[in-house]
């Protein structure tokens, strides 16, 4: 058993070294584009609840471009007859996970979102796979699944 654990630790170090190599062909996430059925309501949610800022709009598509200092989002308005995403039967984005700075901030978001009829809470804050991370899952006003998660630092 000790050999197995040592082997797994060795392989994970080798793998992480390979992933962190300078010659990797891709970098971090640049932005996410979400199709939304309620552009104004979804934009308001990301701005007023999650702290994003609008840095641009495109009235032709229409779209809103948002940023929170760490990530950018493009919200694209769908046609009126758009079909909702079915995570078990369609290929596509299952959910968007957004970091929250503390457990207290996660609980505060839950309390704020709980009073919003246009936002569906799939589950309240709970430990993720036994911890130490804690998360909750919601559907923003257009129905996109958003995970709000806090992972405490390892210090």
Where are these regions (language model features)?
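Positively charged n-region of N-terminal signal peptides that target proteins for export
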Residues: 1-4
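Bacterial N-terminal signal peptides
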Residues: 7-15
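N-terminal beta-strand motif that seeds the catalytic metal site of vicinal oxygen chelate
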Residues: 20-40, 93-98, 152-155
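Core segments of cupin and vicinal oxygen chelate
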Residues: 35-79, 129
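Vicinal oxygen chelate
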Residues: 36-41, 97-142
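Mid-chain, structured segments of secreted extracytoplasmic proteins
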Residues: 60, 65-110
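Active-site beta-strand termini and strand-to-loop segments that position acidic
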Residues: 66-69, 138-141, 151
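Short beta->alpha transition motifs characteristic of CBS
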Residues: 76, 129, 149-155
């Amino acid at each position: 058993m000790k050999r197995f654990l040592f082997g797994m630790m060795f392989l994970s170090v080798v793998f992480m070294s390979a992933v962190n190599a300078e010659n990797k062909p891709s970098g971090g996430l640049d932005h996410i584009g979400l199709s939304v059925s309620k552009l104004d309501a979804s934009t308001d949610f990301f701005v007023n609840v999650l702290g994003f800022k609008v840095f641009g709009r495109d009235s032709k598509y229409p779209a809103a471009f948002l940023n929170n200092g760490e990530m950018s989002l493009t919200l694209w308005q769908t046609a009126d007859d758009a079909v909702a995403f079915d995570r078990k039967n369609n290929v596509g984005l299952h959910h968007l996970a957004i970091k929250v700075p503390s457990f207290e901030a996660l609980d505060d978001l839950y309390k704020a979102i709980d009073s919003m009829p246009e936002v569906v809470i799939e589950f309240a804050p709970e430990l993720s796979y036994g911890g130490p991370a804690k998360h909750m899952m919601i559907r923003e006003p257009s129905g996109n699944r958003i995970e709000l998660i806090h992972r405490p630092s390892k210090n």
